[in-house]
Amino acid sequence: MTHSWLLLTVLGCSAAMADSNNQALIDNAGKQYTGVLSVNQAAGNQHQQINSRAISLGGQASDALIQKLDGKVDPSLNASAAIQGSAFSNGNGILGVNQSAGANNQMINAVRISTGPQSVDDNVLSQQNMTLLPDSRSPSTTGSRQVVTSDQAFTGSRGVVQVNQSAGVGNRMANTLGVTIK
């Protein structure tokens, strides 16, 4: 019985692959998701990605997300990120997608839901990023960057959809949503 479940799991997987050539590709993955779906995909070096969910009944939902990154990278690298086909279409719930290609990219998707009064403070999302060339005397060059999202991706989805998609060096992105029900 275990082997049949394993086979079903392997056959039911969709493509969400990244390679060492700084190319991230999600193709037709996550269709008809229900509930909470969190996807972090990175191709390249030194990426930080968070999908955070905090739910509180009768109290205060909070999360503190801190990312710090210090590394040497070459900004001339080529990078591409793509979400293709009908990926994440016709879903229902909370979806968080972080997709990056390149180096030293930071991404956060955060959702806080609570009952009762609550203040929303964006200071809890603290990010620091330093990107340095290995040799500061080298001439500055820029590589090719490409980000693609299919016009069929995410169609028909309901609920919360948070997407960060980047190709390059030293990008910082955050999507935050705070909901209080009184």
From Swiss-Prot:
Per the record's keyword annotation, is Signal included, yes or no?
Answer: yes
Which keywords fit this entry according to its UniProt record? Amyloid, Cell adhesion, Fimbrium, Repeat, Secreted, Signal
One Gene Ontology cellular component annotation?
pilus
Each FapB_R repeat occupies one of these ranges, namely: 22-58, 80-114, 150-180
Location (main, coarse): other
Signal sequence segment: 1-18
Q: Which GO terms describe its biological process?
A: cell adhesion
Lineage: superkingdom: Bacteria
Compartment annotation? Fimbrium; Secreted
* Knockout-associated phenotype: Deletion of just fapB in an overexpressing strain yields cells without amyloid fibrils. Deletion of the entire fapA-fapF six-gene locus shows no visible growth phenotype.
Family classification? Belongs to the FapB/FapC family.
The entry describes its oligomerization and partners as: Forms fibrils in vitro; in the presence of FapA the fibrils are slightly narrower. A minor component of purified amyloid fibrils. Fibrils are resistant to boiling in 2% (weight/vol) SDS and require >90% (vol/vol) formic acid to dissolve.
Q: Function, please? A: A minor component of the functional amyloid in this bacterium. Probably nucleates fibril formation; FapB nucleates fibrillation its own, FapA inhibits FapB fibril elongation. Upon overexpression of the endogenous six-gene locus (fapA-fapF) in situ, cells form large clumps during liquid growth, make large amounts of biofilm and produce amyloid fibrils. Expression of the 6 gene operon in E.coli strain BL21(DE3) induces flocculation and biofilm formation with copious extracellular fibrils.
What's the protein here called?
Functional amyloid subunit FapB
Starting at the broadest rank, the lineage of the source organism is: Bacteria, Pseudomonadati, Pseudomonadota, Gammaproteobacteria, Pseudomonadales
